[in-house]
Amino acid sequence: MVKYSREPSNLTRSAKAYGAYLRVHFKNTYETATAIKGMLVKDAKRYLNDVIERKRCVPFRKFRGGVGRCAQAKAFKHTQGRWPEKSCKFLLDLLKNLESNAEVKGLEQSKLRLEHVQVNRAPVGRRRSYRAHGRIIPFLSHPCHVELIAVEDEDHVPRHTSTEKRVVKLNKRELARMRLRTGKSLS
């Protein structure tokens, strides 16, 4: 069994999915996962499909060295963005797994929200590249581990707005400041 870095806030109303040693770039997957954090699962799937079709971009915030600018990043109040297709496909597969895990638990698909999304570095895959004049240089891959936790949203009850005036309780310091400002005693 895989150990998650965090437990969900409500064990009975949550579903988990984990991908280990995924042969996909860590940095691209990190940025893509950060973009979908906090979304509903159905919205995240729609967003990732839009990225694959290049209708929307993934904003690059942390690993942005050498990343070109794109106009689609303005939607995220950013300037740099890309369309990491392979990362999106891997995350879509994990979201599909997450949905089936939620279905087994009897959770409602339309209310699932991604509470926790984490991407960690996996051990580097080492290969060789043979160059001119007998040189050999490393040819590395940077895979990753991804963990997702989705929690079913609760139905929010609207707050009751009363017409009565609320009584504000002040501590001694606040009372003293009010007395100094107004020059009167409040008690």
Curated annotation (Swiss-Prot):
PANTHER family: 60S RIBOSOMAL PROTEIN L17 (PTHR11593:SF10). The keyword DNA-binding does not apply. InterPro entries: Ribosomal_uL22 (IPR001063), Ribosomal_uL22_euk/arc (IPR005721), Ribosomal_uL22_sf (IPR036394). GO terms for biological process: cytoplasmic translation. Keywords: Ribonucleoprotein, Ribosomal protein. This is Large ribosomal subunit protein uL22. The keyword Ribonucleoprotein applies. One of its GO terms (molecular function) is structural constituent of ribosome. Belongs to the universal ribosomal protein uL22 family. GO terms for cellular component: cytosolic large ribosomal subunit. It comes from the Eukaryota. SUPFAM superfamilies: Ribosomal protein L22.
